[in-house]
Amino acid sequence: MTDKPIKTLTVEQAAEEAADLRPQLLEWGKQYYEADAPSVEDDVYDRVYARLVALETAFPEIVTPDSPTQRVGGSSRSDLPKVTHDIPMLSLGDVFSLDELTEFDERLRGNVDTPFDYNCELKIDGLAISLRYENGKFVQGSTRGNGQIGEDITANLKTIKSIPQTLSRPLTIEVRGECYMPKAAFLALNERREAAGQAPFANPRNAAAGSLRQLDTRVTADRQLATFMYNVADYEPLTTRTQSGLLDELAELGFTTNATYRVAHDMADVAAYIETYQAQRTELAYGIDGIVIKANDLPLQRSLGATVKVPRWAIAYKFPPEEVQTRVLDIEWTIGRTGVVTPTAIMEPVALAGSTVARASLHNPDYLIAKDIRIGDTVLLHKAGDIIPEISQYVAAKRPAEAKAYVIPTTCPSCGAELVHLDDEVALRCINPRCPAQLAEGMNHFASRNAMNIAGLGPQIVAQLFDRNLVQDVADLYRLTTDQLLTLDKFGEKSAQNLLTAIDNSRNNSLERLLFGLGIRHVGAKAARSLAAAFGDMASLMAADSEQISAIDTVGGIIADSVVTYFANTQVHELVAKLQAVGVNMTYTSGTPATNSTSEFTGKRVVLTGKLQELTRPQATEWLEQHGATVTGSVSKKTDLLIAGEAAGSKLAKAQSLDVPVWNEAQLQAAMDETK
């Protein structure tokens, strides 16, 4: 792509440049839409695409039928049933500056005789979907595909809790929106994938797309996908005739909509909305990559119509990527509790998207080799999906002459055992079951706040316990003595007694904390709680088969298979027996208060949002569930109470729009104090 002003080009020069850009864009689009594995950053694709649009606009005679500008999205997977969109699912035109946005506004108002407002909405970074209802019943769901033909993913969409199976009114209607993966779910998924030796997803959008297009619905069910619906194929079944009203009516029907929208009377209002959410984007629980500006009047939308690819009544303002330069000081290899060995770039600290970054995962050896990152390199750094620090590339002009290609280690940096590639894994793995680093990481997890919550038992102390051969597994913690702890660095009588007290107190934890602490693959804190509540004690769970476990609400087949595999291991049986012998509780006790008494929370659906100051989110959740509440992750008309901490965002706005009662943390604390 050249930087020559288009007005200086001849037709021949424009045609030649466009011919160079088209195959590159088509290949990038195939990787993005079909393989869910983008090879370039969105900003790079957007800029090249914008250049091609500008060329073809200035020289219409060079447009070809196979140009990416004449297509919507990508093609569909060959192994999923096809769905024809009677009304095409169009993509949006892009602008990258307020000047371009003003040009769009002037052009649109020049074609409309009467004044009109815009509706501004967040551009969710996910996968476009369409949901078809007949007489209020969900009958089919599909992806956008190429805009004309998508994939039938009905079975997978039925696993997503935010998609209603029955509407509040018996409408026949097609509703469109975005399926996305929340940031927290994305981080947890990538942690599980890396621990399993699988390549991590590049960003939440690709994670959502890969999860939604699975042939196994159990995979989709385990991925914690969510949706925001924002459009309909035909608005006639609705009572509203505005875009803002459409969002409200969809919420009344039972859909999850994004309550952060704002009606804008002019470009000043639009610019203010952009400024607000460009500043807040990193604080949101989901990824956004821009703002969508739509004519608010639905009949006006219909009269303006669309080009072959984009509607004339809407535009997407794309946020510029925040990218900084820093220098790689070292490449460090760490061993996780499952043996996966991960390279991490240690960098000169640099401010990026609201935080100081000094480390960035290089994921696995293949990634490191492909990026060709070397010690001493100056690199471009950004946050993938506004979350994870990620190196885009090295700066070739600044590479030191002495920088050499990095040599991948062949032995474990902890125990010296040979590192291996297991089948179908991109990760290097240490398979020594007695590797000190793996055992230490497992113990750190066991002691963590959401697991056994052993205050004072941090990584440095765990490392010393292993170095001095005081522990071999987590059961040994319960046999430690004061004299043994006094041999550790910086330990006195008081600190030793405090740690022993914390360890002793953890014996009485409810079963779900122990299950989570054991580090069973795919079993997070929520799944552990469901398992413990359903089976009641460890022996019953260990005796259960996959069918019995997967029958539990919120526990899918993948988790069930993982639990059965874990407890089939004789070493696990020995560990559980050791834990039981030292007095660790093996029964579910968290549910006792809720079953024996009632409270103002009994039977209530409660949502937590924002940052709590005195409590942790798990502590608040556990207390609420003990007192009869069901804690959910999204606000709807069925929500009975929202508890809002600091920096509460879209959930608070939606709760207020639905007249859901809102408490602050102090009110929750007061309720907790009353029950003591």
Swiss-Prot record:
Its EC number is 6.5.1.2. The keyword Phosphoprotein does not apply. One of its GO terms (cellular component) is cytosol. It comes from Levilactobacillus brevis (strain ATCC 367 / BCRC 12310 / CIP 105137 / JCM 1170 / LMG 11437 / NCIMB 947 / NCTC 947) (Lactobacillus brevis). This is DNA ligase. NCBIfam families: dnlj, PRK07956.1. DNA ligase that catalyzes the formation of phosphodiester linkages between 5'-phosphoryl and 3'-hydroxyl groups in double-stranded DNA using NAD as a coenzyme and as the energy source for the reaction. It is essential for DNA replication and repair of damaged DNA. It catalyses: NAD(+) + (deoxyribonucleotide)n-3'-hydroxyl + 5'-phospho-(deoxyribonucleotide)m = (deoxyribonucleotide)n+m + AMP + beta-nicotinamide D-nucleotide. GO terms for biological process: DNA repair; DNA replication. InterPro entries: BRCT_dom, BRCT_dom_sf, DisA/LigA_HHH, DNA_ligase, DNA_ligase_AS, DNA_ligase_CS, DNAligase_adenylation, DNAligase_N. NAD(+) binds at D42, D43, V44, Y45, D46, S91, L92, E121, R144, E178, K294, K318. Belongs to the NAD-dependent DNA ligase family. LigA subfamily. The active site is at K123. Zn(2+) binds at C412, C415, C430, C435. Keywords: DNA damage, DNA repair, DNA replication, Ligase, Magnesium, Manganese, Metal-binding, NAD, Zinc. Residues 596-676 form the BRCT domain. Its cofactor is Mg(2+); Mn(2+). GO terms for molecular function: DNA ligase (NAD+) activity; metal ion binding.
